Amino acid sequence: MNILITGSKGFVGSYIAKHLKSYNVYTPARHELNLFDLNSLTEFFKNHTIDIVIHCALTGREVLNSVDPVYLSDGLLMFRNLWANKHGYKKLINLGTAYEHDLSIDNSMIKEGDFVNHLPLTSYGLSKNIIARIIRDTENFYNLRIFGNFHETESDKRFFKKVIKEDAVVIANDSFIDYIYMPDVIPMIECIINGDCQHRDINMVYPHKYRLSEMAYMLCDFMNLNKNKITIGNSNGNNLTGDSSILSSYNLKLIGLEQGLRNYK
């Protein structure tokens, strides 16, 4: 089984690559495979037998609120070039995002198909929304929608690492937000690879929902940290949670949020 992972140098892509070692995984850097160049990508698929594409490459993730059209066009161009070469592989797994939705409103327990009722204002979100629409109408294309993800190897800039390392943490909007532990993404990817997945759009979320403060306090308990370092601002912000029914229906053996946070020790 030959797998191409785009964006394999980023946090999500590199994690997935490390945990699919039982397969023959291609992880080209940007200078080795230019996703913006249709001819380059077409040539790659001519010269390599690829079964699965896992699309993790993105643009604009660092500037989520930007409306710069460059981030919109870049995100769509990369995906368009992969889509145009769909005859060169069997399946594509897209790492989607809850930012496919309009985050200026509350998004609680959103279902997989709800994104069609949204057109995000941000370039990153709109790009991801359009990609999700194309995937919905393309056979053998899958969208795994990640709301938030975490792992003990993540950057110190991420929320849970800040809770551990910083002397004071301010939660401006204490909303309910879904996070998934990165190891729990792998079983669903393998389910798709093995042909055992009956759904092509899946919210990667757990059934139980937590506020940011609840997760921060939980982590403080596990790490023996002083909870008083946490300051909560607004508790009435917009939530960002998904319906877990489809993911739960597969009865995958998942580690879960609580044990994932324990693993930061």
Region locations from a protein language model:
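NAD(P)H-binding glycine-rich loop region in Rossmannoid oxidoreductase-like domains
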Residues: L35-D74
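Conserved Rossmann-fold NAD(P)-dependent oxidoreductase catalytic core, especially the SDR/UDP-sugar
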Residues: R80-L121
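N-terminal Rossmann NAD(P)H-binding glycine-rich loop of SDR-like oxidoreductase domains
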Residues: M1-K21
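Conserved C-terminal active-site "lid" loop/helix of NAD(P)H-dependent oxidoreductases
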Residues: F44, M182, R211-Y217, T231-K265
